[in-house]
């Protein structure tokens, strides 16, 4: 293509993504858009086409982002090239959203006509506004009996401040309004700016590993043109590669001769090492490099840490390979090796939140067939010592001796909870129980309220979301952002089994709730640990002080069975002999802790 053809083509490109709260119909809308633009034959079409992971289809959520190129003939008779970049809606996957938005010029904001705006919708809209995107509101599910599109339209204007007078009323399920949406994209979303003659700049917004072709980078070309055979350089690492193929997704991978300004597609260059293509990095030509990389988006810091251990310790290296492969297209995952006396060799992993952790665990168990044990999740604490030093603790077993600690600070988040009026009391109760501080309360309309609380992250990590959902019959939605560290009265609680500390069961807890927490855990472990031949005391301790204790009674044989009638001294002798044996057993015996026990410490219900 010459310069004029490229410029003409560029003016016909529209890059957009779809943002929405979970379950507001984003993936269904994406399916309809694919159908409308004839991206697939009827035979290939299946529901939630872009959610290609089994896990995504099962849970009905989008986890990974996906990109597709579509051709659309608009009413003005011109052919347009649309790039749809699908994004997840769940709070843990916000970084996936920020990645896709960085590659777009426009965003379709899908709002459920019955439920209205939810917490995640807002969070994603603000991300889109930060990236200067053109936002097109779409009110979806208007065919529901409970739909009230006019109220929702008003809400979009009041709460977000967008002009919703031209919002499309649609039903992705019934296929209503799809054409209007496509026309609005063509009219309102700006064409990509950039120059195909400038030095090459491509932003990597995702990548995956193919055993035959090496690493495949998903890219958005911002300036310049990239062809097969070009020598390219990664600007963050400085490594150079020769491009072996470029192409686009029409959901299937389709090879092309070149990708130019505004294109969203993939690039393979027989890159063997996963670490060479960091998401957010800029690709440029080795011979004529760009002056500076694109403003990549920031690296996300994990908020929640836990240990992952293979049940079969021989599979330690397989687990490392699995984590390395997942890290490639999950830029928020971090891991480092660690060992535990109870569990052997494993990894300390950092995640964005609990859902992120759960999904990663499930992906490892499914895709790599490795059975895992996970330890209780913890957050990063700052510990200030009496000698003036300070340290960072992300693993309870690294907590220093209580006598040497001056103060401990923990991360706090600002949580915005949107909830129907009837459940305000229930939500306030949960937040207070989680050591939350009330900040603000705003009415969105007659029926819904936004509550703002400051809550320690460690309280959210456990089961905050589950409690919120179950106490509001699933109506509450919730979004949080980190606001910094504050001092708290925190202590480390250890669990001793048969007077031996089990390091994987240690956790950090607030002093006020330590006694109750210890009691519950001790009782729970008593139910879950099988009885042994000797009695096993379970103790919860803080420093040297035992705060709760329970005992698993020993199983014992009836040694008096053979002794008919007989003298009491004879029976006494047999019983004492048994006692001696049990005592000896207790001093050498070790106790196996089942996986359920670790999980029980996790899913602590305070009620």
UniProtKB/Swiss-Prot annotation:
Entry-linked InterPro entries: EF-4 (IPR006297), EFG_III/V (IPR035647), EFG_V-like (IPR000640), EFTu-like_2 (IPR004161), G_TR_CS (IPR031157), LepA_C_sf (IPR038363), LepA_CTD (IPR013842), LepA_IV (IPR035654)
Subcellular localization(s) per the UniProt record: Cell membrane
| Reactions the enzyme catalyzes | GTP + H2O = GDP + phosphate + H(+)
Example GO CC term: the record gives: plasma membrane
Q: SMART domains this protein is in?
A: EFG_C
Enzyme Commission designation: 3.6.5.n1
Its keywords, alphabetically, are: Cell membrane, GTP-binding, Hydrolase, Membrane, Nucleotide-binding, Protein biosynthesis
Q: Which enzyme class? A: hydrolase
The UniProt entry, under Pfam families, shows:
EFG_C, GTP_EFTU, GTP_EFTU_D2, LepA_C
State the disulfide connectivity: none
Annotated GO biological process: positive regulation of translation
Instruction: Write out the GO MF terms.
Output: GTP binding; GTPase activity; ribosome binding; translation elongation factor activity
Residues holding GTP:
23-28, 140-143
Q: Which SUPFAM superfamilies match?
A: EF-G C-terminal domain-like, P-loop containing nucleoside triphosphate hydrolases
Q: Give membrane topology per the record.
A: Peripheral membrane protein
| Domain tr-type G, first and last residues per copy | 11-193
Entry keyword Nucleus: no
Q: Does the keyword GTP-binding apply?
A: yes
Question: NCBIfam families this protein is in?
Answer: lepA, small_GTP
Purpose = Required for accurate and efficient protein synthesis under certain stress conditions. May act as a fidelity factor of the translation reaction, by catalyzing a one-codon backward translocation of tRNAs on improperly translocated ribosomes. Back-translocation proceeds from a post-translocation (POST) complex to a pre-translocation (PRE) complex, thus giving elongation factor G a second chance to translocate the tRNAs correctly. Binds to ribosomes in a GTP-dependent manner.
Q: Which PANTHER family does the protein's record reference?
A: TRANSLATION FACTOR GUF1 HOMOLOG, CHLOROPLASTIC (PTHR43512:SF4), TRANSLATION FACTOR GUF1-RELATED (PTHR43512)
Q: Which family does it belong to?
A: Belongs to the TRAFAC class translation factor GTPase superfamily. Classic translation factor GTPase family. LepA subfamily.
Q: Which HAMAP family match?
A: LepA (MF_00071)
State the name under which the record lists this protein: Elongation factor 4
Species for this entry: Bacillus anthracis (strain CDC 684 / NRRL 3495)
- The encoding gene is lepA
